[in-house]
Amino acid sequence: MKKTFTLADANRTLPLVSRIVRDLVARYPAWRELVEEYELLTSSQRADAPDPRVEQLERQVTAVAREIDGYIHEVTELGAEAQSPLDSGLVDFPGVHDGRSIFLCWRLGEESIEHWHERDGGFAGRQSIGALEFADR
């Protein structure tokens, strides 16, 4: 069963979540650059003349991807969900309000959780937390 957060619980996890997401956001551009370089190199590579850099790039892409997966796993282990694109710094915390499932929505750089959205609403459906009444504020 998935963990659900009260607003206070989610806010208490933010110092740790923030550190993890900061690391994730910092590594993501390096991974994208490596993937783009790999794709460029392999698209122009001839079968009869393999480029020795391809194998090295594959190892680098894999290593950085594992690092990023580790950060995502850490966020997931806490009960939250890192959102795509990964460099957005968005994290959703499953919650319940008035008997319905919602997400408490946080973005890297925000000091506390100030937004929420319906489960199917996504970032575009973000609304101010002030619009909801939470007993645990």
Show the residue positions of the predicted features.
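Long, hydrophobic N-terminal alpha-helical segment
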Residues: 1-44
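Residue-level signal for alpha-helical context at structural boundaries
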Residues: 27-29, 35, 49, 86-89, ...
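Short secondary-structure junctions and interdomain/linker hinges
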Residues: 31, 45, 78-82
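Amphipathic alpha-helical coiled-coil segments
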Residues: 17-34, 57, 61-64, 68-71, ...
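Glycine-rich, aromatic-bearing surface loops/beta-hairpins
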Residues: 69-137
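A short, surface-exposed helix-loop junction/capping segment
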Residues: 45-57
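Alpha-helix boundary/capping detector
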Residues: 36-37, 43, 50, 101, ...
